[in-house]
Amino acid sequence: MERRRGTVPLGWVFFVLCLSASSSCAVDLGSKSSNSTCRLNVTELASIHPGETWTLHGMCISICYYENVTEDEIIGVAFTWQHNESVVDLWLYQNDTVIRNFSDITTNILQDGLKMRTVPVTKLYTSRMVTNLTVGRYDCLRCENGTTKIIERLYVRLGSLYPRPPGSGLAKHPSVSADEELSATLARDIVLVSAITLFFFLLALRIPQRLCQRLRIRLPHRYQRLRTED
């Protein structure tokens, strides 16, 4: 089905408005069947860097590993939007059952991506197309006895809009500044584009073909001249 350009899904608009209307930046992770309720604080999440991976574009795949998951424990993925950190979406499981799904499910490829194995290891797969609505921070979390723990973190960004936090997975050498790194990347791209352009320009002038033909003609004559001199 073809979507109109420039349109925004109504579900996403309502989701943003509802979150903007709330004064607190905390989200309840508990369910009616759970004995305790965990709260997810966005400000606290921003200061946690347990382990990070960066993805630029295409498809982002987040794999969360959990050990010794109990039936009462809640596991899932918390998504924080790149353009507004007060916008938080959750994908939660409890006892192999979805108790909360992402609001923007059109870009959630593996909606039922929970893969259970024998204890003690549990895997949770999240796969989404990288768009303007899905860029941001993905935190693998688990809620147990009223405590929220962040297991793994994935940053998804378009271009260089999302700032690199200190100690990120793509940390550069301390002796290299940001300006030097940007200049080196720009110079490398310019050299690469120039080399490709020159190659196709010479190819259009048939210079490589002519050079190969001249070598094929001259090499036998030189070999015959050497044999005559011997």
From Swiss-Prot:
It is found in: Host membrane. Its main location: host cell. It comes from the Viruses. Residues 206-230 are cytoplasmic. It holds the Pfam family UL16. Keywords: Glycoprotein, Host membrane, Host-virus interaction, Membrane, Modulation of host NK-cell activity by virus, Signal, Transmembrane, Transmembrane helix, Viral immunoevasion. Residues 27-184 are extracellular. The keyword Transmembrane applies. Residues 1-26 form the signal peptide. InterPro entries: HCMV_UL16_sf (IPR038671), UL16 (IPR035123). Glycans are attached at residues 35, 41, 68, 84, 95, 101, 132, 145. The chain crosses the membrane at residues 185-205. Belongs to the HHV-5 UL16 protein family. Interacts with host ULBP1, ULBP2 and MICB. This is Protein UL16. It comes from Human cytomegalovirus (strain AD169) (HHV-5).
